[in-house]
């Protein structure tokens, strides 16, 4: 467990029950994000999402190299979740953030910021060199948070729709 602020947000491993609730919620959420970003059609997005998660987490919460945390608020109650995987980058191993979710009634209270600050301690404890992540282009709130935390863009994909020829 790592503390990160006087307001105290900590991370602890998710329980099996917390993992099951998280997985059931994240599959349709990820599908909706892929549809909103124009990558998938709505018709089969949930099934594609389910398949991606099955591929990424073949042993569920016990998949080697993956770490699933509950984000715990100052009152000791879970306020969200955080999933990282150990990943190889040129010359170093890093924590790749696959998901961070704060429960709707706990958003805009600094929990995500403090969870990432706590994650830095976990990353150091795991012997990893840094933190990498992906953020959807339409998620401007997350982009602002990551900039505040000192993340720098490494790749940017852009898209422009072109109307059909007349």
Map each language-model feature to its residues.
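Actinobacteria-biased recognition of intrinsically disordered, low-complexity terminal regions
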Residues: 1-8, 166
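Acetyl-CoA-dependent GNAT
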Residues: 9, 13-103, 116, 122, ...
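Structural preference for beta-strand elements that scaffold enzyme active sites
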Residues: 94, 130-132
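Conserved acetyl-CoA pyrophosphate-binding loop and the N-cap/start of the following alpha-helix
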Residues: 106, 110-118
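Conserved beta-strand-loop-alpha-helix junction that forms the acyl-donor binding cleft
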Residues: 107, 132-142, 159-165
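Short acidic/polar active-site loop segments enriched in Thr and Asp
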Residues: 129, 152
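Conserved active-site tyrosine of GNAT-family acetyltransferases
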Residues: 146, 151
């Amino acid at each position: 467990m790592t503390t990160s602020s006087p307001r105290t947000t900590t991370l602890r491993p998710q329980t099996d029950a917390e993992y099951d609730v998280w997985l059931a919620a994240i599959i349709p959420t990820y599908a909706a994000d892929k549809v909103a970003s124009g990558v998938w059609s709505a018709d089969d997005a949930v099934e594609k999402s389910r398949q991606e998660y099955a591929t990424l987490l073949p042993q569920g919460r016990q998949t080697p190299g993956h770490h699933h945390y509950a984000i715990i608020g100052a009152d000791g109650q879970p306020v969200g979740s955080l999933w990282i995987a150990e990943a190889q980058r040129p010359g170093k191993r890093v924590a790749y953030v696959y998901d961070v979710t704060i429960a709707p009634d706990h958003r805009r209270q600094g929990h995500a910021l403090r969870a990432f600050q706590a994650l830095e301690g976990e990353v150091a404890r795991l012997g990893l060199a840094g933190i990498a992540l992906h953020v959807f282009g339409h998620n401007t709130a997350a982009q602002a948070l990551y900039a505040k935390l000192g993340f720098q863009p490494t790749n940017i994909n852009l898209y422009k729709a072109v109307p059909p020829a007349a």
